[in-house]
Amino acid sequence: MLSNVLNPSNVAPARNRRSRRRRRASLLSKYTRQTLAGLLAFFVAAFLLGQLIPSPTIPSNIVFISPKYEHYQAHKDDYDTLFFGSSRVYSQIIPAVFDEAASEEGLSLNSYNFGIPAMRAIDSTVLLEEVLANPPKNLKWVFFESILDKGYEPIPNARTNRSIYWHNWKNTQFAAQYILNSDESLPNKAVLLSSHLLPFLYHQLNVGRLFSQLLPSTFTVEEQTVAAEFTATEGFYALSDETTPERQYFLNAQQAYLDSVAVLGGRTADEPWVETVSDEAYLSANKVVLLNRVSETVRAAGAEPIFIDPPSLHLENDFQAAEQLGTIDRLLSYRDPNQFPQLYVPENRYDVDHLNRAGSEEFTRLIAKDFSQMAPSKAAQAKLP
């Protein structure tokens, strides 16, 4: 203080520094308020957009899903049988072959393949619910296939229209419940839950929706070609590209594939096949809820559910356990390389996970034959005159 009295020139710089600090604090506070106000205005505008321009159940810009949904909406009353699932339905069940084989068994059916590549448990169920919200008037049977995974939404998918469109409040809550009711650890549940956060936020903020609804949707030439092919074959798309990495790996690793088939069968060359489903079947609570939800959705549409376990090398036995526990009533399972060797021989496979066209025809005929034998009560309604 004495130095300031003796040296008054020191006071002014100190006051200037304090004044500058106050101005900076004031500006920071002002910018913070403006930023918060801007964010609030953005969220309100996004919400109002959602109210003024309601989002369609399935937008027109979703690869694979939109073309199938549009065809279905235009022709749904022509069908009495629908197939839902992943690529193991999309590229392995041929409606024309199924209908023909069913006719040979005395049944008159008209089916459509609603399989979509890379579908998993949650989004498969969501799609089923969306499609059957307005079911065909003559719907009798719905076949459902899915791997009951952990519920993870891959990060690369988070910003895609295919993931964003279904992450509304209702469906995201369903995904959260599926994860929370699983047997995963708390840290794993946190990771799984977080994977749905970004597509949920994008959906709520209507990212890209204004343009997708006001402007015509466009697909790549390849996507349009594929859509034209599966539209012409009632939703089925044959895997035939010999240049894909999956195909090349399969061709170059035949022995590894055959070894995996042996493991699936529970045997080696000198050991008999051993049933892989244990006597004490178990299914986690979240999977029970999901399968019940699928069955309830199908029955609410006036049809009966049939679950399919395709010929794959996955060792999970969720559908078999569900059947043992009474969670599902009807299951067609083909994960037995001894009972169905024709579905596992390399000449009928496209890659490790999928059948080729010849294998798909064989698989489809088996489904039609087994279906005709397992559901006589409902099938009687569809008998040929």
What residues fall within each predicted segment?
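Extracytoplasmic/secreted proteins, especially bacterial periplasmic and envelope-associated proteins
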Residues: 93, 97, 123-126, 174, ...
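Membrane/wall-proximal cationic-aromatic binding patches
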Residues: 42-109, 126-127
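Acidic-and-aromatic substrate-binding clefts and catalytic sites of carbohydrate-active enzymes
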Residues: 91, 117-123, 282-285, 311-318
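C-terminal regions of proteins
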Residues: 317-385
